[in-house]
Amino acid sequence: MKLNIKLSHSLAACLFGFSSLIYSQSEDQITNFTKAAKFDDIFEVKSLIKAGVSPNTLDPKGNPMLFLAVKENSSKVIDYLTNLPSIDINLPNKSGETPLMIASIEGNLPVVKYLVLTKKADVNNSGWTPLQYACTRGHLEVAEFLVTNGAKVNALSPNNSTALMMSVMSGNEYLVKYLLDNGADLKMRNQQGLTAIDFADIYTKPWIGEGLRSRWAKLYKSTYPEAPSRGPTN
């Protein structure tokens, strides 16, 4: 028994040591990986992975290489990294942003579809969500796809903002209507006590504010109770 325990410990030590060798990388390798991910240099990326660099390596700013590739729409690097067995599709950067989130805010529908349908990326991660990011810039088609594939319309951001509030801020009235027609709650307030209607006022979207007030009156049989105080929100 003692012999077996010693052998087990030795084996574990060897495995952990081997693992550290597999995923060790120098500063130069990280720098080269960062450039390659941004500029879609698939040959350099393959060379680095073959040399033992982890596909989940972070750049000096805390961004995963897949995140960088998605942000720059480096299609060959995206395809290669996402097909590596050890890749973490949902690995966030230090701000909590995932590759799917950056694809969503950029309005890159083909990459969004690929990450969700083929790679099963999480559409409802904690913190800010891909849907909220898409709505921030008014990307209707991305939002429609995410909702169709399970994104929670009324999910709360860290400051309790919603996708509806973000869509109002973007000024895309078609996106606002889509979210409302798919269950967005007009009564929800963020940590500052602001609703989507307040967002329309703060971000000077009067055409949206008018429509939302009309919808409020129809839904709740009353006029919208104006907020006692207003201010910019995060």
Annotate each language-model stretch with its function.
Residues D59, N93, N124-G127, S157, ...:
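Ankyrin repeat boundary/linker residues
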Residues D41-I49, S74-N83, N108-L117, H139-V147, ...:
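Ankyrin repeat structural motif
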Residues S24-F33, N149, N182, Q191-N234:
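Ankyrin-repeat-protein effector appendages
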